[in-house]
């Protein structure tokens, strides 16, 4: 618990093309070494490719992909007595989005396609189709929480 005043979360400026705060956050997560314009080009190219493949609007397809990767529960380590338990806890909405975006970007970076825009586009398409590495990561986290359901009463 903080001893000083609680610091409010900073408002993020929406992205210039779609005026979406969610997409702006995604661009910031993708950004490397402060090169935001390059990250924007990569994301917009990937979204354009994605919308062509799914026949949906760019932002709509992005939201569907994000929804399919968002985790609802995760496990946190909790020390009780001499042993550590993996306790399943519900994920807060802000963290849900952050985890989903991070997993999509990490999975895209690990792919072996030619350009980052293509890798990101393919990963987002896989997420829309409910397959791919990022969706597998979400299912893995859910499985872990399900396996440790017995320790749910240790929640804090």
Curated annotation (Swiss-Prot):
This is Small ribosomal subunit protein uS7. Disulfide bonds: none annotated. Belongs to the universal ribosomal protein uS7 family. GO terms for molecular function: rRNA binding; structural constituent of ribosome; tRNA binding. Part of the 30S ribosomal subunit. Contacts proteins S9 and S11. InterPro entries: Ribosomal_uS7, Ribosomal_uS7_bac/org-type, Ribosomal_uS7_CS, Ribosomal_uS7_dom, Ribosomal_uS7_dom_sf. Signal peptide: none annotated. HAMAP family: Ribosomal_uS7_B. One of the primary rRNA binding proteins, it binds directly to 16S rRNA where it nucleates assembly of the head domain of the 30S subunit. Is located at the subunit interface close to the decoding center, probably blocks exit of the E-site tRNA. GO terms for biological process: translation. It comes from the Bacteria.
């Amino acid at each position: 618990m903080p001893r000083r005043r609680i610091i409010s979360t900073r408002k993020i400026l929406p992205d210039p093309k779609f005026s979406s705060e969610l997409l702006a956050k995604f661009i910031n997560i993708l950004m490397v070494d402060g090169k935001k314009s390059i990250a924007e080009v990569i994301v917009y190219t990937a979204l354009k490719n994605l919308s062509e493949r799914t026949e949906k609007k760019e932002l709509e397809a992005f939201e569907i992909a994000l929804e399919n990767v968002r985790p609802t529960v995760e496990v946190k380590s909790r020390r009780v007595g001499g042993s550590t338990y993996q306790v399943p806890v519900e994920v807060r909405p802000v963290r849900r989005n952050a985890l989903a975006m991070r997993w999509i970007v990490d999975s895209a970076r690990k792919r072996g396609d030619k350009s980052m825009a293509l890798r990101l586009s393919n990963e987002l398409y896989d997420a829309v189709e409910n397959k791919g590495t990022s969706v597998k990561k979400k299912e893995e986290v859910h499985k872990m929480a399900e396996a440790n359901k017995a320790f749910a009463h240790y929640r804090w």
